[in-house]
Swiss-Prot record:
Subcellular location: Plastid, Chloroplast
Protein name in UniProt: Large ribosomal subunit protein uL22c
BP-aspect Gene Ontology terms: translation
Disulfide bonds: none
Nucleus keyword on record: no
Record's subunit section: Part of the 50S ribosomal subunit.
Gene Ontology molecular-function annotations: rRNA binding; structural constituent of ribosome
Free-text function comment from the UniProt entry: This protein binds specifically to 23S rRNA.
Gene Ontology cellular component list: chloroplast; large ribosomal subunit
Entry keyword set: Chloroplast, Plastid, Ribonucleoprotein, Ribosomal protein, RNA-binding, rRNA-binding
Length: 162
């Protein structure tokens, strides 16, 4: 097992068991990889594919994780990694005439979206951590708190479509 170190500038969202072919989801994922968050949202809203909506929800969820958990600004987020993996296959039987049945295989996929904050420089963060760990340095970590008040009935216009 390879251990990967978690990056403090990255947040992710993982969607599993999405009823869609991985090949069809990769078509959309290849278009948004490496783009900014705002540009990605515009592209996904205007693309005519069925795979766009689950990916749009995942990107939106990853950005919400970034702003709520880490205090990142949505303008500074870039999709650093987006991957689609094959999931389990849902197997069903379709009844046919004269007591026969045909198998139906529905492919599923799992999608991982990783957003990276471009405003934070790694060297600044290391210097900040160094001053915290020094004796006589900062006693407590400064935590970014956002005191904006959101209008929860008017803010989420994305979820109206099905």
């Amino acid at each position: 097992m390879i251990k990967t170190k978690k990056n403090r500038y990255e947040v992710y969202a993982l969607g599993q068991h999405i009823c869609m072919s991985p090949h069809k989801a990769r078509r959309v994922i290849d278009q948004i990889r490496g783009r900014s968050y705002e540009e990605t949202m515009m592209i996904l809203e205007l693309m005519p594919y069925r795979a766009c909506y689950p990916i749009l929800k995942l990107v939106y969820s990853a950005a919400a994780n970034a702003s709520h958990n880490m205090g990142f600004n949505e303008r500074d987020l870039v999709i650093s990694k987006a991957e689609v993996n094959q999931g389990t296959t849902v197997k069903k039987l379709k009844p046919r005439a004269q007591g026969r049945s045909y198998p139906i295989k529905r492919p599923t996929c799992s999608i991982t979206i990783v957003l990276k904050n471009t405003s934070v420089n790694e060297e600044e963060f290391k210097r900040y951590q160094y001053t915290i760990n020094q004796p006589g340095g900062l006693i407590t970590k400064e935590k970014y708190t956002d005191m904006r008040c959101y209008d929860m009935y008017n803010n989420g216009g994305l979820w109206d479509k099905k």
